[in-house]
């Protein structure tokens, strides 16, 4: 750090000596001010056309690039508007499809419910018919059973009441009836 201070001190001492030697020279010919001015004006005159044409070309390129960018921007905006319209149309179509799907689902659900009701009614009708058939069969069986029991009872009563003489009389009367029919 001390070295840095020494360096700054040396520079400041030398600067004060140099500043006495810098000054404005009032002799134009000796200072070459005239030559420098002529050279500067000559360069400006010569380079004006060259640089002007370069700058004009550059300006035309920049203007062309800007107009091309503006044209592309306009095309992009047009495509954006078209895409937004297509998006709106697509959303409308999607909404319509969803509505149609919902209506179709409701119709299918209702038709399934209606078919289920019809099937249940058919099952109820078939059940009632089978119950009626079963009742008829049971009634028929009961009648047959009652008839069989009645015949059995009458038969057992007849066996108990009918003896051999009575059997002979019944057989004889049956034979007589058969002769009369013949």
Curated annotation (Swiss-Prot):
Cellular compartment(s): Plastid, Chloroplast thylakoid membrane
Major place of residence: plastid
Gene Ontology molecular function: any one: proton-transporting ATP synthase activity, rotational mechanism
Pfam family, one: ATP-synt_B
Membrane topology recorded in Swiss-Prot or TrEMBL: Single-pass membrane protein
Disulfide linkage: none
Record keywords, A-Z: ATP synthesis, ATP-binding, CF(0), Chloroplast, Hydrogen ion transport, Ion transport, Membrane, Nucleotide-binding, Plastid, Thylakoid, Transmembrane, Transmembrane helix, Transport
TM ranges: 33-55
GO cellular component, one term: chloroplast thylakoid membrane
Listed InterPro entries: ATP_synth_b/b'su_bac/chlpt
Membership in a protein family: Belongs to the ATPase B chain family.
Subunit structure: F-type ATPases have 2 components, F(1) - the catalytic core - and F(0) - the membrane proton channel. F(1) has five subunits: alpha(3), beta(3), gamma(1), delta(1), epsilon(1). F(0) has four main subunits: a(1), b(1), b'(1) and c(10-14). The alpha and beta chains form an alternating ring which encloses part of the gamma chain. F(1) is attached to F(0) by a central stalk formed by the gamma and epsilon chains, while a peripheral stalk is formed by the delta, b and b' chains.
Note: In plastids the F-type ATPase is also known as CF(1)CF(0).
Function (record text): F(1)F(0) ATP synthase produces ATP from ADP in the presence of a proton or sodium gradient. F-type ATPases consist of two structural domains, F(1) containing the extramembraneous catalytic core and F(0) containing the membrane proton channel, linked together by a central stalk and a peripheral stalk. During catalysis, ATP synthesis in the catalytic domain of F(1) is coupled via a rotary mechanism of the central stalk subunits to proton translocation. Component of the F(0) channel, it forms part of the peripheral stalk, linking F(1) to F(0).
Protein's name in the database: ATP synthase subunit b, chloroplastic
């Amino acid at each position: 750090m001390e070295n840095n201070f020494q360096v700054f001190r040396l520079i400041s001492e030398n600067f004060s000596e140099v500043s006495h030697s810098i000054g404005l020279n009032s002799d134009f010919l000796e200072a070459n001010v005239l030559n420098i001015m002529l050279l500067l004006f000559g360069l400006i005159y010569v380079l004006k056309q060259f640089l002007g044409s370069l700058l004009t070309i550059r300006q035309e390129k920049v203007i062309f690039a800007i107009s091309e960018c503006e044209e592309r921007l306009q095309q992009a905006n047009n495509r954006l508007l078209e895409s937004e319209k297509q998006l709106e149309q697509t959303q409308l179509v999607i909404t319509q499809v969803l509505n149609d799907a919902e209506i179709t689902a409701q119709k299918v659900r209702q038709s399934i419910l209606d078919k289920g009701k019809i099937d249940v009614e058919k099952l109820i009708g078939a059940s009632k018919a089978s119950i009626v058939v079963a009742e008829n069969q049971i009634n028929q069986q009961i009648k047959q059973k009652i008839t069989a029991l009645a015949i059995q009872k009458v038969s057992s009563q007849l066996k108990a009441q009918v003896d051999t003489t009575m059997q002979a009389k019944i057989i004889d009367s049956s034979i007589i009836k058969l002769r009369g029919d013949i």
